[in-house]
């Protein structure tokens, strides 16, 4: 295995093979861009949630408003047993989100709370090439963020990508 595959391009030393390496990296980037612009990529957003429809609503609205890029998104909401009242509120919320054209799947499986099990269940059902795990109390606050994350995730030396989480009305993380 070529050790260069695991090294970010900024760290490559200039050698006699640098031109060949530059062509290879440009070729990989072009292939990724081709997939990106052809709409062949999809991001599966997995959101574990239970008994939190008001907070979830803010999350979903910010996600759908701020994810208008080139990359298709599907949302998988994994609920491990909300009350009947909160389940109904969540289903109504999902209906409104679906009306806006965003595909949402609601996985309702009552069980003891286990965050990793909920995430894994969403991952099992996901159809996207990329998985985005998002807590239900997160609000997206910038445009173009998803495109930027996917472009970085497509690099051959990247295993995962994350963002800074800020407290509301603050620059503190």
Residue positions per predicted region:
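Short aromatic/hydrophobic "clamp" motif used to bind/position activated sugar donors
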Residues: 131
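Active-site acidic Asp-centered loop
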Residues: 80, 134-136
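Acidic donor-binding segment of Leloir-type glycosyltransferases
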Residues: 64-108
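Non-catalytic membrane-proximal stalk/linker segments that position and tether the catalytic domains
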Residues: 1-41
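Glycine-rich, basic loop-to-helix element that forms the pyrophosphate-binding segment
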Residues: 109-126
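A conserved hydrophobic helix/loop-capping motif in glycosyltransferases and polysaccharide synthases
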Residues: 43-55, 59, 66, 78, ...
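Conserved donor NDP-sugar-binding/catalytic core segment of glycosyltransferases
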Residues: 138-173
């Amino acid at each position: 295995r070529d050790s260069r595959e695991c090294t970010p391009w900024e760290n490559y030393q200039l050698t006699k093979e640098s031109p060949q390496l530059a062509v290879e990296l440009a070729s990989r980037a072009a292939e990724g861009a081709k997939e990106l612009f052809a709409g062949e990529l999809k991001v599966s957003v997995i959101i574990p949630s239970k008994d939190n429809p008001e907070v979830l609503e803010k999350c979903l609205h910010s996600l759908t408003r701020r994810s208008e890029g080139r990359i298709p998104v599907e949302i998988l909401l994994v609920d491990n047993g909300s009350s009947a009242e909160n389940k109904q509120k969540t289903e109504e919320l999902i209906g409104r989100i679906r009306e806006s054209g965003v595909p949402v799947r609601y996985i309702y499986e009552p069980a003891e709370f286990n965050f990793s099990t909920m995430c894994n269940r969403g991952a099992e059902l996901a159809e996207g090439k990329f998985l985005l795990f998002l807590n239900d109390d997160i609000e997206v606050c910038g445009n173009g963020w998803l495109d930027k994350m996917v472009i970085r995730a497509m690099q051959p030396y990247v295993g995962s990508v994350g963002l800074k989480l800020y407290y509301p009305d603050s620059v503190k993380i």
